[in-house]
A protein has these predicted regions:
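Forkhead-associated
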Residues: 72-115, 119
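Intrinsically disordered, low-complexity acidic Ser/Thr-rich regulatory segments
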Residues: 1-66, 76-81, 109-132
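Amphipathic hydrophobic-ligand
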Residues: 68-70
């Protein structure tokens, strides 16, 4: 059975548990990596970040950046849900999608291998996590 070790108290927990069974420390990857499926360029971060046209143009060097708003979406930690989320910025002309579905205002949990995009086909960014 797969497990994880709590960095706070050393307890071995089942892999499916989102929090340590003893101290309730969240089992949440510290680093999120977004990789452009078009260019292979990456952005790596450990705290909440907002993404938009400038980042898509310069960091990912993707021509699809022209379809993005100045601020398109944000990636943030939700310690209550023990998850990283993608949440759209309000008022964007093109919807932010996750795995082909529009992201609601409250956001969607990110998973390893998931794909964030503008609409269903533009500016595809694959999600990866680095373990703690």
């Amino acid at each position: 059975m797969a497990t994880w070790i709590c960095p706070e108290d050393g307890t071995e927990n089942p892999a499916a548990e989102k929090r340590c069974l003893v101290c309730r420390h969240p089992n949440l990857p510290r680093v999120v990596v977004l990789t452009s499926l078009a260019t292979g360029k990456e952005a790596e971060f450990t705290e909440a970040k907002k993404f938009g046209k400038a980042v898509f143009t310069h960091r990912f060097a993707d021509d699809d950046a022209k379809y993005a708003a100045d601020l398109q979406f944000e990636i943030l930690r939700d310690d209550d849900r023990v998850a990283w989320l993608v949440r759209p910025c309000p008022g964007t002309p093109n919807k932010t999608c996750y795995d082909g579905f529009a992201v609601p205002a409250e956001g969607v949990e990110l998973a390893e291998g998931g794909v964030i995009s503008l609409g269903k086909t533009k500016m595809k960014l694959k999600v990866r996590f680095k373990k703690n």
